[in-house]
Every structure is written in structure tokens, then in C-alpha cells.
From Swiss-Prot:
It is found in: Cell membrane. The chain crosses the membrane at residues 44-63, 68-90. It is a multi-pass membrane protein. Keywords: Cell membrane, Membrane, Transmembrane, Transmembrane helix. This is Uncharacterized protein AF_0145. The keyword Cell membrane applies. GO terms for cellular component: plasma membrane.
Amino acid sequence: MCRCRCMAMMSFVAIVTPLTMLTGLIDWKYRYDMRKVPIIQRKVITGIVGYVFVVVYVVLHSLTDYSLAALAMALVFFAITGEYGGKLVHGARTLLCLKNLRKGSSQKSNPN
């Protein structure tokens, strides 16, 4: 019973994760002008790796019990991704790179 619920939840995650990644890329495009800030690069990489582990879990779930290791790794990578997202949203004032990024985008829109 528990395995069926877990499988259903991870199937939902496998469907929804690409949509959340797409909205993040759209936000990156319009808010940060697609600048390659290291924290954004790490967030994208950990999100993709977490998604790969979700797909591995969904595929291997019916074949082996080792799929739980993939589930655990997905949760770890999504937790790291969430930490980076929190730093972007709540810690933007303290991060020098994002402060410079904001100054660069405001100068771009206001040439004075």
C-alpha cells in the first residue's frame, strides 16, 4: 500500500517537475536577463539531477528494491535545489553577485 502511494507521488513529481523547471527558466530570462550567476547554475544542475533520480525511481520501482536509493538521492538533490532557491529569493540582499546583477539590470533599463 505504501509503495503504491509513493509510486503515485513520484509519478506526479515526474510530471510536474519539468513544468516547475520551465517556470524557473522563464523567471531567469525575465528577472535576471539570463545571466550566468553561479548560484543559478548550481540550482539548475541540482534540479536536473534530482529529476533524473525521480525518473530512475519510477522506471526501476517495479524491477528492484534498489529504487529506494534513487528516491533518497532525488530528495537530497531537491532539498539542495530548494536551499539555492531560498538563497535567491530571501537572501538576495546579502549575496554580492545578485546585488551586482540587480544593479546591472537596473542600469540597463534606466540609461541615466
